[in-house]
Regions:
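Histidine-acidic metal/acid-base catalytic patches
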Residues: 55-63, 70-186
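Active-site acidic/histidine proton-transfer and metal-coordination neighborhood
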Residues: 1-58, 168-175, 183
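Short, histidine-centered active-site or binding-site loop motifs used for metal coordination
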Residues: 28, 65-67
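Short, surface-exposed loop/turn motifs that are enriched in glycine and acidic residues
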Residues: 36-40, 67-74
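A residue-identity detector for tryptophan
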Residues: 15-17, 65, 109
Length: 186
């Protein structure tokens, strides 16, 4: 419940963090009869709780692209969540991991940290990932990057038991290359 989150956050914020910002990452919430991965609070409840704490504490929220897509079962829900956080001036970070609506290895609408989709400039990718370069660009275009504390990636190479170190490193390196290209870094 939102009350439980508030109590937990109040306890956590009572500890000495030496000025550090405490950030929560939104996870999918239970929606109607749709199977959920985490089934936590709605983003509205999380934002409301953080706003209540914001006057006295340095707090924020991170939006994970895949987790928001899982919640909405679509690629527009991450943008909706980001816009809500921006409107409330509480967005602290963006995390990019992919998701699929039809992948055998990573599952359908599963929080398995699926890599980015195919891009002409990368060697390592997942064909069925909904996280395309276009979706990343659309996401970054609505955010003033100077106003967020960080961008990140969460990726997993599957199958776990036969993934090589080259593939694991390559997936992360290629993801950073895609982000750098979108952001204009060379």
């Amino acid at each position: 419940s939102a009350d439980s989150l508030l109590k937990s956050m109040e306890e956590i914020l009572s500890w000495d963090w030496e000025g550090s910002k405490i950030v929560i990452e939104h996870c999918d919430t239970a929606v109607d009869n749709i199977p959920f991965e985490k089934g936590f609070l709605t983003i509205e409840d999380e934002i409301k709780t953080l706003i209540e704490l914001q006057g006295m504490h340095n707090v924020g929220i991170t939006i994970n692209w895949a987790r928001s897509a899982i919640e909405g079962r679509n690629i527009t829900k991450p943008l909706e969540h980001i816009e809500l956080a921006l409107k409330s001036n509480i967005l602290s970070g963006l995390m990019f991991s992919g998701v699929s609506d039809n992948d055998i290895q990573y599952g359908s609408w599963k929080d398995t940290h699926m890599p980015f989709s195919k891009n002409e400039n990368v060697q390592f990718f997942e064909e069925n990932s909904l996280l395309t370069q276009e979706e990343i660009s659309n996401t970054l275009n609505i955010v003033d990057l100077d106003s967020v504390d960080y961008l990140g990636v969460k990726l997993l190479s599957m199958p776990i038991d036969s993934s090589t170190i080259d593939r694991r490193v390559g997936l992360n390196s290629d993801a950073v290359s895609i982000l750098n290209k979108i952001l204009g870094f060379r």
